[in-house]
UniProtKB/Swiss-Prot annotation:
Source organism (scientific name): Lachesana tarabaevi (Spider)
Name recorded for this polypeptide: M-zodatoxin-Lt4b
Function of the molecule: M-zodatoxin-Lt4b: Has antimicrobial activity against Gram-positive bacteria (A.globiformis VKM Ac-1112 (MIC=0.3 uM), and B.subtilis VKM B-501 (MIC=1.1 uM)), Gram-negative bacteria (E.coli DH5-alpha (MIC=4.4 uM), E.coli MH1 (MIC=4.4 uM), and P.aeruginosa PAO1 (MIC=>35 uM)), and yeasts (P.pastoris GS115 (MIC=>35 uM), and S.cerevisiae Y190 (MIC=35 uM)). Does not have hemolytic activity against rabbit erythrocytes. Causes paralysis, but is not lethal when injected into insect (M.domestica) larvae.
Taxonomic placement: Eukaryota, Metazoa, Ecdysozoa, Arthropoda, Chelicerata
Origin superkingdom: Eukaryota
Keyword list, A-Z: Amidation, Antibiotic, Antimicrobial, Fungicide, Repeat, Secreted, Signal, Toxin
Motif window: Processing quadruplet motif 3: 96-99
Residues making up the propeptide: 23-43, 63-71, 91-99, 119-127, 147-154
Motif (Inverted processing quadruplet motif 3): 119-122
Amino acid sequence: MKFSIIALALAVAFVCVAESRSEEEGYDVSEEIQAEELEEAARGGINRKLMEMVNKLRKVQGREDSEDAGRAGINRKLMEMVNKLRKVQGREDTEEAGRGGINRKLMEMVNKLRKVQGREDSEEAGRGGINRKLMEMVNKLRKVQGREDTEEARSLKDKVKSMGEKLKQYIQTWKAKFG
């Protein structure tokens, strides 16, 4: 968890520095970022994106005002996840969609969450049911992802390391220019 927070902080800092640099030098960083996103999606970005969503849902789950989060935040996040999964499942050329494994399990979990979400006793579901279902989903995702996590973690670690080095270089050039 600490590693992902550090990685996120580095990514945000990298983008901020790159954008300020691009404004000064008149070059567009959005193309570079878009290329990185496409590359990330090609390397199994689906699983990583789902884990990011799960981590965001954990933050919502941990809040003390779980009643409000249960009614508004979690439901909105779940609908975003459903829409993303529909887009992924609609692609016939995706390997995972072809095999059906990960996407089928996720759609089963989403359908279970929809049943909980649709109940009229939303207060009860918001406090306990959805949180329990989310933790079950986290555990299932961990089992599915555990097979390829080592390889992805290494590539992510290398990517974060290179981003950190780039960030250091940008900071040094910025300090050299502006003192």
